[in-house]
Amino acid sequence: MSSIGAGAGGAVVGAAVAAVAVGGGAPPHVLAVDDSSVDRAVIAGILRSSRFRVTAVDSGKRALELLGSEPNVSMIITDYWMPEMTGYELLKKVKESSKLKKIPVVIMSSENVPTRISRCLEEGAEDFLVKPVRPSDVSRLFSRVLP
């Protein structure tokens, strides 16, 4: 895995989030879901260095539990392959929920499988990122997905 630093992409996102905070809004709250503690720490670190508020959980089941008690999540970034519930299954549950369906969901995977990517996008994923996720990926997501 490559070393991730707060490069130019992270600075752009940080500036954009700081502008939101100066305007009186709270930083966007991102729910990061990954069963790998290493990958979870990497994505959470990138998001936090860009001044996002991050909650990181290790499963789709825990993500749904958290969303049930705190639906004010700005975006969900989830791994595709996880035990018990895949990121694809989490995506479907979020999009089927009248309370949660407007939350943008981004799927991540270490595998670049075109049919999987297409299926996730057709089910309503905002984007599909191939790991390792970089600060520039987060910058692009912020400018495109979050208002």
UniProtKB/Swiss-Prot annotation:
It comes from Oryza sativa subsp. japonica. InterPro entries: ARR-like, CheY-like_superfamily, Sig_transdc_resp-reg_receiver. Two-component system major event consists of a His-to-Asp phosphorelay between a sensor histidine kinase (HK) and a response regulator (RR). In plants, the His-to-Asp phosphorelay involves an additional intermediate named Histidine-containing phosphotransfer protein (HPt). This multistep phosphorelay consists of a His-Asp-His-Asp sequential transfer of a phosphate group between first a His and an Asp of the HK protein, followed by the transfer to a conserved His of the HPt protein and finally the transfer to an Asp in the receiver domain of the RR protein. Induction: By cytokinin in shoots. Residues 29-146 form the Response regulatory domain. Disruption phenotype: Dwarf, narrow leaf and low tillering phenotypes. GO terms for biological process: cytokinin-activated signaling pathway; phosphorelay signal transduction system. Belongs to the ARR family. Type-A subfamily. The keyword Cell division does not apply. Functions as a response regulator involved in His-to-Asp phosphorelay signal transduction system. Phosphorylation of the Asp residue in the receiver domain activates the ability of the protein to promote the transcription of target genes. Type-A response regulators seem to act as negative regulators of the cytokinin signaling. The modification 4-aspartylphosphate is found at residue 79. Pfam families: Response_reg. Keywords: Cytokinin signaling pathway, Phosphoprotein, Transcription, Transcription regulation, Two-component regulatory system. The keyword Signal does not apply. This is Two-component response regulator ORR11. PROSITE patterns: RESPONSE_REGULATORY. It comes from the Eukaryota. The gene is RR11.
